[in-house]
Curated annotation (Swiss-Prot):
Stretches the record annotates as Disordered: 1-53
GO-annotated biological processes: cell differentiation; cell redox homeostasis; spermatogenesis
Modified residue annotations for Omega-N-methylarginine: R26
Keyword Nuclease: no
Lineage of origin: Eukaryota, Metazoa, Chordata, Craniata, Vertebrata
Note: The thioredoxin reductase active site is a redox-active disulfide bond. The selenocysteine residue is also essential for catalytic activity.
Source organism (scientific name): Homo sapiens (Human)
Glutaredoxin domain mapped to chain residues: 56-156
Source domain of life: Eukaryota
Ribonucleoprotein among keywords: no
N6-succinyllysine sites (modified residues): K379
Position(s), cross-link Cysteinyl-selenocysteine (Cys-Sec): C641-U642
Protein name from the UniProt record: Thioredoxin reductase 3
Gene this chain is encoded by: TXNRD3
Broad enzyme group: oxidoreductase
A GO-annotated cellular component: nucleoplasm
């Protein structure tokens, strides 16, 4: 006769259990039997890092060697119910009763670092962390537990990563270094205009790398203009050649694609250029461009599918508009361009296109750079406007119509006001959409294994170890809910995830005070809180904001405008004037911000800035001489480059 498993425990219900005092049930191999106190770590200072590391290695080894491990307490009714469940299934378990070992409290501390779970029971099945009592019964009811318990269970891979972008590749390479069998699935669905690319994800192919190179190309044009004031003489007409630039950039990107493939090969990571989709627990279907399907299994999975540009959902958008997916490899100069959107992608692209001498208009629905400091955002927009970029504020497109075919052709755009009934129309050669990005999570079979996503955004909620609600599935990169959408963040979180999964480290990714830079013609770098967010969190009366305008030395001889570049720090007055927000608008803002971000990690204060001797003459030194507060209302305009 089949044995019926016990029912899932209700809230606060312990239920009857054999040998309630010890929690011992048939089929449970108790590693520390009652009456014999065991020690898992070597004697010595109870909190020494060496002893703690030895204990962690011991626990990881126990988990990896065991089919089922239950970290329990003999008197805990929920632990007893879990042991009853496995007993009813005829499964022998390794049980460690933490109240019956000398260092049980330390074991529980280290377990909480490994699993982000502070309570018992704490259950692992075939190296997969299932969770506590409720999660174990949920896994049983969904069929996941039975899948994990299959006899002689052998997966094709220790880890399969879906997505070959920055986060996925970082995780894959680190897992391989740790001796694990790893596969990366990566497939680029062509854009509506037919654009696709190689291994490396958005950043390398259609994001950070080509964007920064085109930004640099535009800066070189400005440098040519400035050079005459510095004595350079040339007679040839200066003009920009789009085809020459894009060919050089695409050649560089191709070399990076090849480098990634070579790196995976050297680390024995299997790379499959196929579209990955879950079909059942621990099993995935890989479909290549020919439609051929192959199935793979793995003990654990990482979702790193990234995002793709959003479309407007209006007549003509997918037929005639392009996005950042298409721009960087466009085989012809885009000509007169309408950029739709006010994201950092929109403003960066508008900035370098204008820098090439093109006629550029930005259509803005509401505010610039949503999520960034709005004072800084408006200064970014103001500088762009002064340098030839036109802005259409409070309008949205409602139709795009092709007037002429060509490379480029001609498009008519009809737009309406967001504040009334006014409509406008304009003719452009190219319409570039940069209105946001959507997570690539809705068509990879997550619903088949029960992974939860935010239905509105498509983002995946995870805990602080990047674990989804399904124990063996993790996620990294831009698809994470409420995390920065930045390449270095994905790289760091992917690497640390692999180290935690395979016992090399307990370190978690720190998502606080992550620096970033908007590469508009005048760069905007920041770290920490915007002024609006700081006021919301700390209240205005608890803050002191120091700011100033400045004039870079290299702009003076060239005759470029003074009192345009701007620096600002936001300090918490009641925490030793700790810097909680750093903002700079100026040349090389990204390079300036990086070092200050490290200082903020170390608890940078206003006094530490004052005590720092600046490097003269540089833009960064302005932060060592900040004196004027916003609350004072004093004038911050500068008469010369040295203040």
């Amino acid at each position: 006769m089949e044995r019926s498993p016990p029912q899932s425990p209700g809230p606060g219900k312990a239920g009857d259990a054999p040998n309630r005092r010890s929690g011992h049930v048939r089929g449970a191999r108790v590693l520390s039997p009652p009456g014999r106190r065991a020690r898992l770590s070597s004697p010595g200072p109870s909190r020494s890092s060496e002893a703690r590391e030895e204990l962690r290695r011991h626990l990881v080894g126990l988990i990896e060697r065991s089919r089922v491990v239950i970290f329990s307490k003999s008197y805990c009714p929920h632990s007893t119910r879990v042991k009853e469940l496995f007993s009813s299934l005829g499964v022998e378990c390794n049980v460690l009763e933490l109240d019956q070992v000398d260092d049980g409290a330390r074991v529980q501390e280290v377990l909480s670092e490994i699993t982000n779970q502070k309570t018992v029971p704490n259950i692992f099945v075939n190296k997969v962390h299932v969770g506590g009592c409720d999660q174990t019964f949920q896994a049983y009811q969904s069929g996941l537990l039975q899948k994990l318990l299959q006899e002689d269970l052998a997966y094709d891979y220790d880890l399969i990563i879906i997505g070959g972008g920055s986060g996925g590749l970082s995780c894959a390479k680190e897992a391989a270094i740790l001796g694990k069998k790893v596969m990366v699935l990566d497939f680029v669905v062509p854009s509506p205009q037919g654009t696709s690319w190689g291994l490396g994800g958005t950043c390398v192919n259609v994001g950070c790398i080509p964007k920064k190179l085109m930004h640099q190309a535009a800066l070189l044009g400005q440098a040519l203009c400035d050079s005459r004031k510095f004595g350079w003489e040339y007679n040839q007409q200066v003009r920009h050649n789009w085809e020459t630039m894009t060919k050089a950039i695409q050649n560089h990107i191709s070399s990076l694609n090849w480098g990634y493939r070579l790196s995976l090969r050297e680390k024995a990571v299997a790379y499959v250029n196929s579209y990955g989709e879950f079909v059942e627990h621990h099993k995935i279907k890989a479909t290549n461009k020919k439609g051929q399907e192959t199935y793979y299994t793995a003990a654990q999975f990482v979702i790193a599918t990234g995002e793709r540009p959003r479309y407007l959902g209006i007549q003509g958008d997918k037929e005639y508009c392009i996005t950042s997916d298409d721009l960087f490899s466009l085989p012809y100069c885009p000509g007169k361009t309408l950029v739709v959107g006010a994201s950092y992608v929109a403003l960066e692209c508008a900035g370098f296109l204008a820098g090439f001498g093109l006629d550029v208009t930005v259509m803005v629905r509401s505010i610039l750079l949503r999520g960034f400091d709005q004072e800084m955002a408006e200064k970014v927009g103001s500088y762009m406007e002064q340098h030839g970029v036109k802005f259409l504020r409070k309008f949205i497109p409602v139709m795009v119509q092709q007037l002429e075919k060509g490379s480029p052709g001609k498009l008519k755009v009809l737009a309406k006001s967001t504040e009334g009934t006014e409509t406008i129309e304009g003719v452009y050669n190219t319409v570039l959409l940069a209105i946001g990005r959507d997570s690539c999570t809705r068509k990879i079979g997550l619903e088949k294994i029960g992974v939860k996503i935010n239905e509105k955004s498509g983002k995946i909620p995870v805990n602080d170890v990047e674990q989804t609600n399904v124990p063996y599935v993790y996620a990294v990169g831009d698809i994470l809910e409420d995390k920065p959408e930045l390449t270095p963040v994905a790289i760091q979180s992917g690497k640390l995830l692999a180290q935690r999964l395979f016992g090399a480290s307990l370190e978690k990714c720190d998502y606080i005070n992550v620096p970033t830079t908007v590469f508009t013609p005048l760069e905007y770098g920041c770290c920490g809180l915007s002024e609006e967010k700081a006021i919301e969190v700390y209240k205005k009366e608890n803050l002191e904001i120091y700011h100033t305008l400045f004039w870079p030395l290299e702009w003076t001889v060239a005759g470029r405008e003074n009192n345009t570049c701007y620096a600002k720090i936001i300090c918490n007055k009641f925490d030793h004037d700790r810097v909680i927000g750093f903002h700079i608008l100026g040349p090389n803002a990204g390079e300036v911000t990086q070092g200050f971000a490290a200082a903020m990690k170390c608890g940078l204060t206003k006094q530490l800035l004052d005590d720092t001797i600046g490097i003269h003459p540089t833009c960064g030194e302005v932060f060592t001489t900040l004196e004027i507060t916003k609350s004072s209302g004093l004038d911050i305009t500068q008469k010369g480059c040295u203040g």
